[in-house]
Amino acid sequence: MASEIAIIKVPAPIVTLQQFAELEGVSERTAYRWTTGDNPCVPIEPRTIRKGCKKAGGPIRIYYARWKEEQLRKALGHSRFQLVIGA
């Protein structure tokens, strides 16, 4: 059994919606759809509803390192890889 280790470089552990869309090669609308709604598949920072407001405001911050880790684990079928953050 080979003990290959994949090394993946990630710019930051948490990115904005625009950065995520650019990194993943999708439109901002698609990235927004992945983060919100009934079935979000991208992990985001919890957003709070301020007093007097009906919806949560502010920019969406995505846990990009966690997202990449999940994607790699599914694609490779193992967890023998390294995420290099800040590269």
From Swiss-Prot:
Function description? Antagonizes transcription from pL during the lytic response.
Supply the gene name: apl
Q: Does the keyword Transcription apply?
A: yes
Q: Which GO terms describe its molecular function?
A: DNA binding
Q: Look up and give the organism this protein is from.
A: Escherichia phage 186 (Bacteriophage 186)
User: Which of UniProt's keywords are assigned here?
Assistant: DNA-binding, Early protein, Transcription, Transcription regulation
On the tree of life, the source organism's domain of life is Viruses
Query: What is the official name of this protein in its record?
Result: Protein apl
